[in-house]
Amino acid sequence: CWPFLLGFLIFITYFLVILGSGTNICIILTDRRLHTPMYLLICNLAVVDIMFTSSTSTTMISVLLGEVKTISYYSCISSMYIYHLGDITGCLALSLMALDRTIAISNPLRYHSILTNAQIFVLIIASWFIGIICLGIALAWADFDNLPYCQPIIRYVFCDYPALIRAACVNPEPYFLIPTILALWLLAGQFPLIILSYVKIIYTLLRLPNSESRAQGFNTCICHIIVVSCYYAPKLVSVLLTRIGVRLNLTERNALLIIATLLPSLINPTIYCLKTKEIRKRLVQILSRRKRTVSIKCQKG
């Protein structure tokens, strides 16, 4: 019974992620007033969320709810590639959003001259390029096509780098060297920058004389802090448990993987739809217009 319940829960979560992130993308792309650096970054994060969640949720739903409990080797490799690419670009996207908010709050008068849409496009493309390069290095180091596999079974809920390495009949430690260095560079490099950015933002907001501007700034800042916390918290918990010597069993590890994969992608569109005034206002306009259209058609009928 529990596989069906878990699969159904993942299906509902995946549906909400697609609905929320897709709504954000459509609203931002169709409203020229939202073609600003902040909203372009939100749109980029929504694309990452859809890609990141789709790479794992579709496999989990198929295995838990479907009759076929297998996945082809190349489908597994593709799923792993998309999953880790989404993870890396998501990390870099949060850094770009922290940079954007730091400039917007610390230098509001020069914001549009410091950050233009063209510069944001370049930064977004660069973040994807970095993700592709980092992932290419890790995959070249592992050389999955030439690994000897003991059995065609992955004891994880989806395909990722550790799962495929541990399924092979090799000592896994050397294969984690380069990916660990890359992960430390990303997490240890980006996370402190994000923390320092928000410390600077909070310091700037506390110095504002206008309470209304201060409240508006904190409102925006809290949205981003929640998103960052949901992204990094499961990863930090996993690292801390490993450092203090707590060994997770397979069920606990899979549960942490599911939370780390689905929670950020579910929270992000909810936060930006409910807390971002312009997106919320545009969404209300679309819904009220659709309701009015349906009402007119009913009256004519």
Which stretches of residues belong to each language-model region?
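Transmembrane helical core of 7TM receptor-like proteins
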Residues: 1-301
